[in-house]
């Protein structure tokens, strides 16, 4: 619903002298087209020239690389403060959707903006949607403002000290031009509240606003995906199905999402079936973790589903509200893998060092669907620990083997193949890579390596690590994440004063952006061939 508003913004204001900050950047595509980057949207060969998010390296019209939500007002406050310190007079504009207002940082920014007493224009794009429907008390006030055309005396924005202007026809360019012209060069922090329609102008998007948030390449005429993925399994849907069954067995089981209900497999129909046993808190990861801790403390069985990239937003709550208290909430971490989203703002390979180093947390790394659900079954049932489970990779993998049903005896690795000379500890989704390395060593060096599924990211199986000192010269660790602060470093530290050689394989610490998966794996020597060469060089 931001196409018309973006055109009006660029008509009224003088970008980049006047600075525009787009929240999340999902709303910035029209902005990019109007600032010299339309070729990336029209010519397939230029597609990768431009990212899906605002990016200062692309254009002087972009001021931040942004991909997470609720940040634009705070960033704009900073730009306004810097402008005032330097004696500037340009307009500072933050564009934020109503869905993003559910995030705590948005409230913090609005509260600060209300006392700045200077030019700061906040465009609230209210299309009555987040990714799915909005949740939170604030939206009752937005509805009241829409119903009264902005005239209600109960006005959330005014209560914070912000001036306020309502535009009921938020997809009408003349109305928008008039509103923006009215607030241009204002000396006060001002909210321009525009009521828009999500997907305006494209019938399939208007008809299914939630589904089209995730849409893959599609046929323009029909709106149908070019590749039919309807028959493919995915961990999101499987998790939702599992939890819905648990809810029927136990009325204290609660599924929690933070603005992305389908991450945990709760489609509109499943949300309806779950009733009060499903809670979407809006885009508020911090609150979601604290809520889960509170539910667990009260005797409930909460399961919070979240993408790896968004776990970063709730570190303090994981540490303070959950783990210090030791409450048995469950967190399922999705897309924690190098094979997931590949843009710099949505990387999924920083969660291992972040989560696994918090005391009291049990962080599990299943290797396949069967092991994942065995761990999830135990995690929901147990009452001793906060448990996080790293959902294994992007694609569903199945194994025909028996998996444990009780993980209460912590930090016990599973030796799946006993060998000698080389021991491979292949964590989670990289278990298959460990199997491939084992086969490569047999083929090329005649070494029958030991293969181990560590299962626990958060601790060491010291008896097994001691056992490996007999008959093994090299221990290899494989992890689907950054090495710094990760699983492999714990193993290397354990063997530090011994004769054991330890090779850690994972990703170097960097903000990789729009990478080719195969190229990134090779750059980090994460192929069976490269690792086998390294091992052969040591064995001689």
Residues of each region from the PLM?
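Cofactor-binding active-site loop characterized by glycine-rich and histidine/acidic residues
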Residues: 2-116, 253, 258, 267-268, ...
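Non-catalytic terminal/interface segments that mediate subunit docking, oligomerization
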Residues: 19, 202-312, 317-327, 426-428
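A glycine-rich helix N-cap at a beta->alpha junction
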Residues: 41-50, 115-129, 323-335
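Glycine/charged-rich beta-loop-alpha catalytic/anionic-binding loops adjacent to active sites
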Residues: 51-65, 87-93, 267-282, 300-302, ...
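Glycine-rich, anion-gripping cofactor-binding loops and their flanking helix/strand elements
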Residues: 104, 168-184, 271-300, 304-321, ...
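Peripheral docking tails and interdomain loops at the edges
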Residues: 223-229, 340-342, 362, 482, ...
